[in-house]
Amino acid sequence: MIKQRTLKQSIKVTGVGLHSGEKVTLTLRPAMPNTGVVYYRTDLNPTVAFPADPNSVRDTMLCTALINEQGVRISTVEHLNAALAGLGIDNIIIEVDAPEIPIMDGSASPFIYLLLDAGIEEQNAAKKFIRIKEYVRVEDGDKWAEFKPYNGFRLDFTIDFDHPAIGKDVRNYEMNFSAQAFVHQISRARTFGFMKDIEYLQSQGLVLGGSLDNAIVLDDYRILNEDGLRFKDELVRHKMLDAIGDLYMAGYNIIGDFKAYKSGHGLNNKLLRAVLANQEAWEFVTFEDKEQVPQGYVAPAQVLI
């Protein structure tokens, strides 16, 4: 049987909030089978819980934010969510003493190290997957994202920025998902932004924690980071990272073929909602026999950094 996974022990880290610029303490705790992914704002009294749910994603400007019925939010969850998807963690309690998850270095890599340091253990309950059964597509102008059936999790993402530093040869990335592929090919890709946009946003009191330490920054002509890029196509790899995190907002790893053109947090969420709203388009599956599970989902906890 392919089993659910959680952490072996709790672990804590301190970082900076991307939007507030303030110190944030993040604590990750084990959870019982069938708990799912649950975020908690511990700075509020009483503590407010945000179960991962695509219908709770009510703001996708600049990041993915969960907002409850009372208007309370927790922001910038997508990179941590991507790390959970990458390692196949089904059940976890995530506590944060601020309105946002710390940005760390702008990628999912610090969260991967944190989760592996805590340790991952299997639980005595069958792991559920969402299997795509029918073609589903959403569009927004010239942007689009789609799912179709596939026995695995395949991703194909294309960006299109008119910028001298983003050539046509680095605008597309394709990957057959596995824990190893995610850790080595995707998790280290950092978020990015354009200097003119960052200056405007900071003048509006936003992205106050943004810096060259946690983002790739481009001016009109070049990349400003002294150390350059981690991959020549790091920007499109990061957009794939975002998509993996956004699609894991359902709380289950997906079996299907995902393809997107110029998609972002909003369209990723719209696609996930469209899939789940159509009962004919998907189904829950479990695997009693490890021989039957798609190759990319075999033993995702066994990752070599």
From Swiss-Prot:
**Cofactor(s) for this UniProt protein:** Zn(2+)
Q: Which domain of life is it from?
A: Bacteria
Q: Which UniProt keywords apply?
A: Hydrolase, Lipid A biosynthesis, Lipid biosynthesis, Lipid metabolism, Metal-binding, Zinc
Is Zinc among this UniProt entry's keywords? Answer: yes
Instruction: Please write the reaction equations for the catalytic activity of this protein.
Output: a UDP-3-O-[(3R)-3-hydroxyacyl]-N-acetyl-alpha-D-glucosamine + H2O = a UDP-3-O-[(3R)-3-hydroxyacyl]-alpha-D-glucosamine + acetate
Give the record's GO CC terms.
Answer: membrane
Q: Which InterPro entries match?
A: Ribosomal_Su5_D2-typ_SF (IPR020568), UDP-acyl_GlcNac_deAcase (IPR004463), UDP-acyl_GlcNac_deAcase_C (IPR011334), UDP-acyl_N-AcGlcN_deAcase_N (IPR015870)
Q: What does this protein do?
A: Catalyzes the hydrolysis of UDP-3-O-myristoyl-N-acetylglucosamine to form UDP-3-O-myristoylglucosamine and acetate, the committed step in lipid A biosynthesis.
Tell me what this protein is called.
UDP-3-O-acyl-N-acetylglucosamine deacetylase
Gene field:
lpxC
